[in-house]
Amino acid sequence: MSRATITREGARLQLLGVLDHASVPVLREQGRTLIAQGSGPLVLDCAGVEHSNSAGLALLLAWLRDAQAASRPLTIAGLPSELRQIADVSNALELLPLAEQAHS
């Protein structure tokens, strides 16, 4: 399993690796910093997430709050099925602004 990272290239944030209780606290702060830098809409690309538990969902929701506070619309792309299922059983799926929904 890979160490988790968050990077930014322009308006795209890329999330990679394993999201769990060990990796999420550091990612939380890194993501908050990246969201606060700049302005305009962001896309969070989650296609590189290898594994996640409920801590990963909590991380996404926290970043959504950060983006809202910074007046930066955030769309989530490439949400892995494992994380989608966690959000679904937690009744939180409708809270996630998924890129796939934007085209529906």
Task: Label the model's feature ranges.
Residues 1-55, 61-104:
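STAS-like cytosolic regulatory interaction modules
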